[in-house]
């Protein structure tokens, strides 16, 4: 594996251990040239997924993009990053287990909203404001009202 600091091609694994219920291997690496230390994660990828965007174009599924969007929603909410990592892994497993080579960004968004609703209402509202493209304060009011009544659009994630 290439060193992220000096770009040297050959690094050594100093420690390997399973994490996330055995679905990921965490490796601590060290560069023999610059001495830089870094962590890599190895996980099984069942299939390549394509995301169908609202615009009609396709792009490869990007786990890191999903993670960044959830991290933005939970920022400053005191939620354990390891827990968020497990949530993201669960969402990815759900997507892969659908058996479909392509999935709409809408379905991904619904899965994320369902997960966030069970974690933190504020994170749910933050994500919903982007996912649902809120335009004014009444949009926030509506989703808060839905939350208080227990109504969400995540109930039927995969009903077509």
UniProtKB/Swiss-Prot annotation:
Concerning InterPro entries, the annotation shows: ATP-cone_dom, NrdR-like_N, RNR_NrdR-like
Domain spans labelled ATP-cone: 49-139
GO terms in the biological process aspect are: negative regulation of DNA-templated transcription
Write the signal peptide boundaries: none
Lineage, top-rank taxon, reads Bacteria
Q: Name one Pfam family in it.
A: ATP-cone
This protein's UniProt keywords:
ATP-binding, DNA-binding, Metal-binding, Nucleotide-binding, Repressor, Transcription, Transcription regulation, Zinc, Zinc-finger
Q: Key word Protein biosynthesis present in the record?
A: no
Co-factor(s)? Zn(2+)
Instruction: Show the GO MF annotations.
Output: ATP binding; DNA binding; zinc ion binding
What does the UniProt cofactor note say?
Binds 1 zinc ion.
What are the start-end ranges of the zinc fingers (unnamed)? 3-34
Q: Which NCBIfam families match?
A: transcriptional regulator NrdR (TIGR00244)
- What does the sequence similarity comment in the record state about its family? Belongs to the NrdR family.
Q: What does this protein do?
A: Negatively regulates transcription of bacterial ribonucleotide reductase nrd genes and operons by binding to NrdR-boxes.
Task: Report the protein name in the record.
Answer: Transcriptional repressor NrdR
Can you name the source organism?
A: Bartonella henselae (strain ATCC 49882 / DSM 28221 / CCUG 30454 / Houston 1) (Rochalimaea henselae)
